[in-house]
């Protein structure tokens, strides 16, 4: 049996964000939610609506929850997601700081995971490009490409 959350993710991935949100929002409370998948989905749904304040609050909670559980996998995901929110708003310096924080976790806890490294380096390259640091951006983009092959 497929859960409401799985169905909502499927709807989101099909671009049906309002349908996805209707399916899960009544069960969602930022204050009590401890489900990383639901937090992540609600964050994406609110980002699609450009509700940056709520989205930021969700991913700050996501990071705090991961830290409380010493869950480095979800901590690095939360940092990456929060960086995407700041990037979407044009706050590239704050986005870069969060991506660099994520990089430290990936390097220390996932040193052999080239996918995590490639995704992080792509984001570093993209944000540095947006900051007009073109040489640095190219270095990170090339590194991302190498790691993804």
Locate each region found by the language model.
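Residue register of alpha-helical TPR repeats
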Residues: 2, 37, 77, 117-119
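Amphipathic alpha-helical segments of tetratricopeptide repeats
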Residues: 25-29, 61-67, 100-108, 142-149
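Residue signature of alpha-solenoid helical repeat architecture, marking inter-repeat boundaries
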Residues: 33, 73, 113-115
């Amino acid at each position: 049996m497929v859960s409401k959350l799985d169905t909502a993710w499927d709807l989101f991935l099909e671009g049906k964000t309002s349908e996805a949100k209707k399916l899960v929002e009544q069960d969602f409370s930022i204050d009590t939610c401890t489900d990383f998948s639901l937090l992540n989905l609600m964050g994406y749904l609110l980002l699609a609506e450009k509700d940056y304040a709520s989205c930021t609050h969700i991913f700050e909670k996501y990071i705090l929850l991961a830290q409380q559980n010493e869950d480095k996998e979800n901590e690095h995901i939360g940092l990456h997601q929060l960086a995407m929110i700041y990037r979407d708003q044009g706050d590239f310096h704050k986005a870069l700081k969060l991506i660099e924080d994520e990089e430290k976790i990936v390097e220390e806890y996932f040193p052999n995971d080239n996918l995590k490294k490639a995704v992080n380096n792509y984001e570093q390259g993209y944000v540095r490009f947006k900051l007009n640091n073109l040489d640095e951006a190219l270095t990170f983009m090339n590194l991302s490409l190498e790691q993804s092959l």
